[in-house]
């Protein structure tokens, strides 16, 4: 399905083209980058290895086209976004097929990601019209010592060219979460997709192409991060960077210079379970929060901090549910599918071996076939184990037994991450106090961590990020304030 039908223009031979100047192009490098299917561990797709000169050309065009796009009426911008959203949903099957083959996301979840992405784009259109359609009016005499001789008019104007870098795990959804706000705000956008997920992104970008956006307003540049990564993030034509991924973002933030940054860099999301918690509810949320998409989510539960008095019961309930998880290929909608790469699988295995050497209790036998790792609950994990602190990004979940809520809070806050967390208790007063004490961007009460709905604020503290996402916050972040002051010859008071 990939590269066929309406998508025939985006591929030549067995290599997908990149998108620039409103056209699908082959790179002058003559080189390509292979995309490995996580399930078969064989080359599934190839994409262009773009050059630095091709990056320059995309940036140059984006700068020019953005000036005109900024003068396009808000209603027209919104109209085109709604059209792109409809096309995206119409072709959800082809894009979902790419996700299945590139990142081993279960087929049903892949379709859900595309539909959710269409909804996000439409919401951006609506929210942008509301948000950007209003300005602010200030008068000077509210500040001491001033008469009403100055009228201040403020509005939000675009930043210019946005560089968007989404991660492999939600390449389409986390691309449009940057594209939608950028475009409705009047910006141009250059997309650097992840290698795993690049073809899904190219298919998604073609939907925007079919919607009729101005040529050059959107570019999708594929290639090796080692060759064009730093060149893109340090490019003088970039006016803002929106990045979702791992600790690469820290290096980007140090090199980016004087441009606004929106960064989400992973987490070690803690789940604190008190004695009065509904343990059946906890167990269900642990499965959903810890093992969906094989734990390859920034907002996955990464460590359970459970009170000693209820730990045995909770572990028993979770183990019963783990036993029912299906393991296999994404085409079969298995609960647990292969992790994205061999290097990821090796990293996860290293955490497992460390835990075993240091005495963790294995609730299941550790099993791995290629990139496929069976779900594993590790009980009696201690703070000296790597799994207590590091983000596995896989179906491995540690349980640390605690004797007080304060102990759980301390472990959460001792982490260098601070993305999300959750607390389970029937006492809302305790829940609020614990939420306030946890140094994380979002705390869920009686539910697993989650990104969304997509209009909710989404942010990380500490090494988990810079700034806040969510549709409204992203639109605001991709604009700046412009002020015009009208100076009157004498004070003027309404109806005075």
UniProtKB/Swiss-Prot annotation:
Residues that, per the record, bind substrate: 116, 169-170, 297-299, 451
Cellular component, GO, one term: cytosol
Active site: 264 (proton acceptor), 298 (nucleophile)
EC number: 1.2.1.9
Induction comment from the UniProt entry of this chain: By salt stress.
Primary enzyme class: oxidoreductase
Reactions catalysed according to its record: D-glyceraldehyde 3-phosphate + NADP(+) + H2O = (2R)-3-phosphoglycerate + NADPH + 2 H(+)
List of residues binding NADP(+): 192, 195, 230, 391
Family label: Belongs to the aldehyde dehydrogenase family.
Function: Important as a means of generating NADPH for biosynthetic reactions. May be a main source of cytosolic NADPH for mannitol biosynthesis in leaves.
Protein name as it appears in the record: NADP-dependent glyceraldehyde-3-phosphate dehydrogenase
């Amino acid at each position: 399905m990939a590269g066929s039908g309406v998508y025939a223009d985006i591929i030549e031979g067995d290599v997908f083209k990149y998108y620039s100047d409103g056209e699908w192009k082959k790179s002058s490098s003559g080189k390509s980058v292979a995309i490995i299917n996580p399930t078969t561990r064989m080359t599934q797709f190839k994409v262009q290895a773009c050059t630095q000169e091709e990056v320059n050309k995309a940036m140059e065009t984006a700068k020019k086209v953005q000036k005109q796009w900024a003068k396009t009426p808000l209603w027209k911008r919104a109209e085109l976004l709604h059209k792109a959203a409809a096309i995206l949903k119409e072709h959800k099957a082809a894009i979902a097929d790419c996700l299945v083959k590139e990142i081993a996301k279960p087929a049903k979840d892949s379709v859900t990601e595309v539909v959710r992405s269409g909804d996000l784009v439409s919401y951006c259109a609506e929210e942008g019209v509301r948000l950007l359609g209003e300005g602010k009016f200030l008068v000077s005499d509210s500040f001491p010592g001033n008469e009403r001789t100055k009228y201040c008019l403020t509005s939000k104007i675009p930043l210019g060219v946005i560089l968007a870098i989404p991660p492999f795990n939600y390449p389409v959804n986390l691309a449009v979460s940057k594209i939608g706000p950028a475009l409705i705000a009047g910006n141009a956008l250059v997309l650097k997709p992840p290698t795993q997920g690049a073809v899904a992104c190219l298919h998604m970008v073609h939907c925007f192409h079919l919607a009729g956006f101005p040529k050059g307003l959107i570019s999708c540049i594929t290639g090796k991060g080692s060759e064009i990564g730093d060149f893109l993030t340090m490019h003088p034509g970039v006016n803002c960077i929106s990045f979702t991924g791992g600790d690469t973002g820290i290096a980007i933030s140090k090199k980016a210079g004087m441009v606004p940054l929106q960064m989400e860099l992973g987490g070690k999301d803690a789940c604190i379970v008190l004695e009065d918690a509904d343990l059946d509810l906890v167990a269900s949320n642990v499965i959903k929060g810890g093992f969906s998409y094989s734990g390859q989510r920034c907002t996955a539960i990464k460590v359970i901090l459970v009170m000693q008095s209820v730990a045995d019961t909770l572990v028993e309930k979770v183990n019963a549910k783990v036993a029912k998880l299906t393991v296999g290929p994404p085409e079969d909608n298995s609960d647990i599918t292969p992790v994205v790469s061999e290097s990821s699988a090796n990293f996860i295995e290293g955490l497992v071996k460390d835990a075993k050497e240091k005495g963790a209790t294995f609730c299941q036998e550790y099993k791995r076939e290629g990139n496929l790792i069976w779900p594993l609950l590790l009980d009696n994990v201690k703070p000296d184990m790597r799994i207590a602190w590091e983000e596995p990004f896989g179906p491995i979940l540690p349980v640390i037994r605690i004797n007080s809520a304060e102990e759980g809070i301390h472990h959460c806050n001792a982490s260098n991450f601070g993305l999300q967390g959750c607390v389970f208790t029937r006492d809302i007063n305790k829940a609020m106090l614990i939420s306030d004490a946890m140094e994380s961007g979002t705390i869920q009460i009686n539910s697993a961590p989650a990104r969304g709905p997509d209009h909710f604020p989404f942010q990380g503290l500490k090494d988990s990020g810079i700034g806040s996402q969510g549709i409204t916050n992203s639109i605001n972040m991709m604009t700046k304030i412009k002020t015009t002051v009208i100076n009157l010859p004498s004070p003027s008071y309404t109806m005075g």
